[in-house]
Amino acid sequence: MLILTRRVGETLMIGDEVTVTVLGVKGNQVRIGVNAPKEVSVHREEIYMRIQAEKGNGNVAPGNY
């Protein structure tokens, strides 16, 4: 796992087309913005896990996708 430190307003790049920007920090919550092409699915982990379970792929463990 790559671990990075970013401040509010700073961005990181994933490949050539996906950006993740830190929008704000409040207590133990971090607001992030993700810009990605519409053909790239972006989900919170718990939503992704639910989608996989509904597809019958319930054997996907968190962090193993």
Curated annotation (Swiss-Prot):
Its main location: cytoplasm. Pfam families: CsrA (PF02599). Gene3D superfamilies: Translational regulator CsrA. Keywords: Activator, Cytoplasm, Repressor, RNA-binding, Translation regulation. Belongs to the CsrA/RsmA family. A key translational regulator that binds mRNA to regulate translation initiation and/or mRNA stability. Mediates global changes in gene expression, shifting from rapid growth to stress survival by linking envelope stress, the stringent response and the catabolite repression systems. Usually binds in the 5'-UTR; binding at or near the Shine-Dalgarno sequence prevents ribosome-binding, repressing translation, binding elsewhere in the 5'-UTR can activate translation and/or stabilize the mRNA. Its function is antagonized by small RNA(s). This is Translational regulator CsrA. It comes from Vibrio atlanticus (strain LGP32). The lineage of its organism: Bacteria, Pseudomonadati, Pseudomonadota, Gammaproteobacteria, Vibrionales.
